[in-house]
Amino acid sequence: MKQFIDFIPLILFFIVYKIDPQNVEFAGFNLSGIYGATATLILASVIVYGALWLKHRHLEKSQWFTLGACLVLGGLTLAFHEDTFLKWKAPLVNWLFALAFAGSHFIGDKPMIQRIMGHAIQLPQGLWVRLNIAWVVFFLVCGFANLYVVFTYPNFWVDFKVFGSLGMTLLFLIGQGLFLARHLHDADTGEKPKD
């Protein structure tokens, strides 16, 4: 459910981008296309994460980072009327997540994925390390895929940002689920998990 909530601002961004081709002027700013969608992304992010914070009195670090990147890069996009700032958001966020997951091998006593999921499932330490490395690779691939599409297919990048990123995430989560199911099944049957 958390992943869906995090995608709400992006989905609204996509909808506004697709249905708002006409030229809209507001307070001296052109808010058509990418700029109207960016304003929607910023507003939706503030509302979604604000509501989550009011409900739980807590946001995860990744949510704070995503909100901050949205506000800064989206704000720069609107202020300078230059969409390049927003185009760098997805690669930068993904690469910084990769850095955080990779850094967790050296800082602290557990890999990042174990810190996130360790309360829910038990795995041997070697599997936590492999799973964490898989997340590092996933975030790196997502960042480079976004960057490639942004600068190679500029007319397609918004579609990729929504459907490509979402599709890659779903496929990765399914793969992770299958990987975990195999090892959790080993634990249930009493077999020694494959490390």
UniProtKB/Swiss-Prot annotation:
Bilayer-crossing regions? 34-54, 65-85, 88-108, 131-151, 160-180
Q: What gene does this protein come from?
A: yciB
The text of the family note is: Belongs to the YciB family.
Q: Say where the protein is mainly found.
A: membrane
Protein species of origin: Pseudomonas aeruginosa (strain ATCC 15692 / DSM 22644 / CIP 104116 / JCM 14847 / LMG 12228 / 1C / PRS 101 / PAO1)
Q: Which UniProt keywords apply?
A: Cell inner membrane, Cell membrane, Membrane, Transmembrane, Transmembrane helix
HAMAP family, per the entry = YciB (MF_00189)
The source's superkingdom equals Bacteria
Q: Pfam families in the record, alphabetically?
A: IspA
Q: Which GO terms describe its cellular component?
A: plasma membrane
What is this protein's function? Answer: Plays a role in cell envelope biogenesis, maintenance of cell envelope integrity and membrane homeostasis.
InterPro entries from the UniProt entry: YciB
Q: Where in the cell is it found?
A: Cell inner membrane
Membrane topology, as annotated, equals: Multi-pass membrane protein
Q: Species lineage, top-down?
A: Bacteria, Pseudomonadati, Pseudomonadota, Gammaproteobacteria, Pseudomonadales
State what protein this is by name: Inner membrane-spanning protein YciB
